[in-house]
A protein has these predicted regions:
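Alpha-helical repeat/alpha-solenoid scaffolds of the HEAT/ARM/MIF4G superfamily
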Residues: 1-6, 13-22, 38, 138-210
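Hydrophobic residues within the alpha-helices of tandem HEAT/HEAT-like
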Residues: 65, 79-86, 101-105, 114-125, ...
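C-terminal transcriptional activation/regulatory domains of eukaryotic transcription factors
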Residues: 40-43, 47-50, 60, 66-67
Length: 210
């Protein structure tokens, strides 16, 4: 896979934007951004080099999501979405992204952006499989149920909760369609290793409910 220079320029710009937002705080994240930019520059020098995204390139976003600062997390999720859309995530990195999203759901941070990222992650490729595929569905169900398990007097006053719930419901419908498409494909080629319908039902997803 050849990576075009304009795409690499966009990715470098995202890291610079995150670094600027950090100001003088979070030195490790700034250093991670600088390291990622250097790695991208090396790739820019030879466009024939295949870019197999690794921990160095997602690390700035991982660290930023751990800060619990909404502005940094929002920027990071948008950056991750671009990496996904450009087909730059390998399997290991994609699973790290799922774990990041899980932690954000647990802490009720940027839920709408999390749902958007899940959609991009599962509709752009077929890297996410097995337990991590089930986990993405569980996250969506949890956010959908948020409207029902939260005190209704609070829901009535907080439109954001209702918006999150309705967005999660729409996301679930879309992801179920994706899962069934994979099931149909698996019936043709059972060696692909995608999460089968039976395994999805049998999987102990209850342990992920928050």
């Amino acid at each position: 896979m050849k990576i075009q220079k304009p795409i690499l320029d966009v990715l470098q710009s995202d890291y610079r934007g995150l670094s600027t937002e950090l100001k003088k705080k979070y030195v490790p994240i700034k250093e991670a951004c600088e390291k990622a930019i250097i790695k991208l520059r090396e790739i820019c020098d030879d466009l024939n080099i295949s870019l197999n995204i690794g921990k160095d390139l997602i690390l700035p976003y991982v660290l930023a999501c751990e800060t619990k600062q909404h502005n940094l997390i929002s920027i990071s999720l948008m950056g991750l979405q671009k990496l996904i859309l450009y087909q730059l995530l390998n399997e290991e990195s994609s699973y790290i992204v799922v774990d990041i999203l899980k932690n954000l759901v647990i802490n009720s941070v940027e839920e709408i952006r999390v749902l958007q990222t899940i959609i991009v992650l599962l509709t752009s490729n077929q890297i996410i499989k097995h337990e991590h595929l089930a986990l993405t569905l569980v996250m969506c169900f949890n956010l959908n149920f948020k409207n029902y398990i939260t005190d209704q007097s609070i829901v009535a006053k907080d439109k954001e909760i209702s918006t999150i719930s309705s967005t999660a419901a729409a996301t679930i419908q879309q992801l179920i369609s994706v899962v069934f498409d994979r099931i149909s494909f698996e019936q043709i080629d059972p060696n692909k290793g995608y999460l089968s319908f039976d395994n999805l039902l049998k999987y102990k997803i209850h342990k992920y409910f928050m």
